[in-house]
Curated annotation (Swiss-Prot):
Cofactor note as given: Binds 2 magnesium ions per subunit.
UniProt name for this protein: DNA polymerase IV
Sample GO molecular function, one term: damaged DNA binding
Organism: Xanthomonas oryzae pv. oryzae (strain MAFF 311018)
Annotated catalytic residues: 103
Cofactor list: Mg(2+)
């Protein structure tokens, strides 16, 4: 039986800002650029009490909390702290799979330290993070990645939760299906329309029925309802692509997608900055109302050097969609692929918006 730990830093970007500026502590902090098309990168727990969440439009966050303190993101600083945290992970196991700067899976089945109890390993990791970075992290401990990720949310912030193999059914069955990763508002609504509200409801449905309604995702739902997840922890995978998607509550015409594409381009650009790598190929993904998936891509001579350039290329790709004008779309996505490392110096400054200081 594997021992998997999912570690998730608490309000990471906002917590770094509060750590480094004592004047921000105890106040609603929103990490975001101001602007009509900006989205929230992170919100402190004080800001979350007003309903502010990551990926929310910044203008909405400002309406929810007019007194919120907006801080522009500093990904160079966040990356440096992330390296500190990752070094702590590697003291315990080489099987570390980063998901982003602020979370990772660890397989501690055979920990380097010789410690046997995954709960004790997780506690020690969280203690080391607190002592060495002055930040807090939460952890979930379980026999697989799916369960560990759910568990890490259970005692946030600054806590941990274990799902023992003997307790999987007792934990899973009462859960609302929207706690399953990948089940968002739209999917939750579709499941509810079928009378599926809890994981217990989901488990009663045969695989064939779920596949008929949800295609390949139906198989994933079937397995997750049984707590099954055989995916291994894959150490330090290089990023091959970054993308953001929106699924709509109502199907939209192609010409109604522009505002969504602009917002998704910003989310994708922010995610790309976190990797400190260059994506050369722009990808537009569409799903029609009858679940047909289309992708269009473009690899310009020079990679997009700004969020605006990425957005313009993605918008241009909509003109390469050759479907009847009456076609309606239920999903749009914007992505970057074909990654390479950012050059040091001037190129990095050009790509990631750093303005050289006059000497």
């Amino acid at each position: 039986m594997r021992k998997i730990v999912h570690v998730d830093m608490d309000a990471f970007y906002a917590s770094v800002e509060q750590r480094d500026d004592p004047g921000l502590r105890g106040k609603p902090v929103v990490v975001a650029w101001r602007g009509a098309r900006s989205v929230v990168c992170a919100a402190s727990y004080e800001a979350r009490t007003f309903g502010i969440r990551s990926a929310m439009p910044a203008v909405r966050a400002e309406r929810l909390c007019p007194n919120a303190i907006f801080v522009p993101p500093d990904f160079v600083r966040y990356k440096a702290v992330s390296r500190q945290v990752r070094e702590i992970f590697h003291r315990h196991t080489d099987l570390v799979e980063p998901l982003s700067l602020d979370e990772a899976y660890l397989d501690v089945t055979q920990a380097k330290t010789g410690m046997q109890l995954a709960t004790e390993i997780a506690q020690l990791i969280r203690t080391q993070i607190r002592e060495e970075t002055e930040l807090t992290a939460s952890a979930g401990i379980a026999p697989n990645k799916f369960l560990a990720k759910i568990a890490s949310d259970w005692r946030k912030p600054d806590g941990q939760f274990v799902i023992a193999p003997s307790r999987i059914d007792a934990f899973l069955l009462p859960l609302k299906v929207n706690r399953i990763p990948g089940v968002g508002k739209v999917m939750d609504g579709k499941l509810a329309a079928l009378g599926i509200v809890t994981v217990a409801d989901l488990r009663l449905r045969p695989l064939e029925e779920l596949q008929a309604h949800f295609g390949s995702f139906g198989q994933s739902l079937y397995r997750r309802a049984r707590g099954i997840d055989e995916r291994p922890v894959e150490p330090d995978q290089d990023v091959q692509s970054v993308s953001s998607e929106d699924t709509f509550s109502e199907d939209l015409a192609l010409d109604a997608l522009d505002t969504h594409i602009l917002r998704l381009a910003e989310k994708t650009w922010l995610a790309t900055r976190r990797t400190e790598r260059i994506g050369r190929t722009v990808v537009l993904k569409l799903k029609t109302s009858n679940f047909r998936i289309l992708t269009r891509s473009c690899t310009p001579e020079q990679p997009p050097v700004s969020q605006e350039a990425l957005a313009q290329i993605a918008l241009a790709l909509t003109r390469r969609v050759e479907l009847p004008a009456q076609t309606r779309y239920r999903l749009v996505g914007v992505g970057l692929s074909g990654f390479s490392n950012v050059e040091e110096g001037a190129v990095q400054g050009q790509l990631f918006g750093e303005i050289p200081q006059a000497e």
